UniProtKB/Swiss-Prot annotation:
Localization per Swiss-Prot or TrEMBL: Cytoplasm
Taxonomic lineage from the root: Bacteria, Pseudomonadati, Pseudomonadota, Gammaproteobacteria, Pasteurellales
Gene: sdhE
Gene3D superfamilies cross-referenced by the UniProt entry: Flavinator of succinate dehydrogenase (1.10.150.250)
Protein's GO biological process: succinate metabolic process
Similarity section: Belongs to the SdhE FAD assembly factor family.
Biological function: An FAD assembly protein, which accelerates covalent attachment of the cofactor into other proteins. Plays an essential role in the assembly of succinate dehydrogenase (SDH, respiratory complex II), an enzyme complex that is a component of both the tricarboxylic acid cycle and the electron transport chain, and which couples the oxidation of succinate to fumarate with the reduction of ubiquinone (coenzyme Q) to ubiquinol. Required for flavinylation (covalent attachment of FAD) of the flavoprotein subunit SdhA of SDH and other flavinylated proteins as well.
Pfam families per UniProt: Sdh5
Listed name of the protein: FAD assembly factor SdhE
Amino acid sequence: MAEYDKLRLEWDCRRGMLELDKIIMPFYLEQFDNLTETQKATFVRLLACTDLQLFSWLFKRARASDTELQQMVDLILEKQGVVINN
């Protein structure tokens, strides 16, 4: 079982784009503790991505080439009740 620095993760959830903050931070605060260890590790990897990548994925402009990252994006959108109509 991995140990996660909660303060560091919360800081990493703060992004340079308000649109991302409104999706990622609430997901972290409400859902992170309920994720599996694999999902937690994937979420941490997702936070290492650029804001531009996250925006593209979360607003369905593109799909992540990494299947695990795309599954996490889909989970975030589902849990946060985000509906993006393209």
